[in-house]
Amino acid sequence: MDDYFNNYWTMKKLRDGAGEIVQKKFVKFYPLNDPARPSEAHKLWLNYVMSANNVMDFGAGDLRFREFVLRNGFKGRYRALDIGKDFKYDFADLDETREKFDLILCFEVIEHMELPKFVGLLDKFRKKLTDGGKLIITTPNIHHINHFWKGDVTHVRPYPYEDLYALLRGHGFKSAVMYRIVWWESESPVFYAKFSLRRILTHILGVDYATNIGFVASA
């Protein structure tokens, strides 16, 4: 936290430039209940995995994404890390391994962390990545209206995309691209009509219709 304020103006300059890296086209997402029917978001992340040799899934959860990756022919090393006890993971803490990774995945984890802990984790991620390695982070979009009306008691800190971009760049990542992720309920005409109306209303209200955001940062 002190590091952020000690470099406040540098971080502010980075934050002010965040809009340049936002991808205008949104990416559809829905749960990976059937590995044969992945969403656009899962296909996007899979492309990054297939280009790597050594992957760390930080906060691997129910391991569905790992199963999806392996079913699609990934031949590299895929390490799963989580503090949970419901599934078998390779690690419970990043300090348990001295390996370097081409890709670190961190899906829907950082909103469970206060800022000082997350900043410390970013530094660890940077040290664990190979030169040119990539970090993928997804988190709820604070600019989405659900942030105001719905919540999760385990979420302790929202991360606006502007600040997340500044933190990534300020902690040694050379570049970052942001994707806007939309929870896609179905392909029915009714949902398309609802979604079109939602886009109009959120524009009027000055909020975003993208439910989540995803960053791909390069070390």
Locate predicted features.
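Conserved N-terminal segment of class I S-adenosyl-L-methionine
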Residues: M1-E99, L103, P116-D123, K128, ...
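Short, contiguous strand/loop micro-motifs
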Residues: L32, H112, K150-D152
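A short beta-strand submotif of the Rossmann-like class I SAM-dependent methyltransferase core
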Residues: L103-V109
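Hydrophobic adenine-recognition pocket in adenosine-nucleotide-binding enzymes
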Residues: V109-H112, N141
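Short glycine-dipeptide loop
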Residues: L129-L135
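Short, glycine-/aromatic-enriched active-site segment of Class I SAM-dependent methyltransferases
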Residues: I137-V156
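Short alpha-helix
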Residues: V156-G172
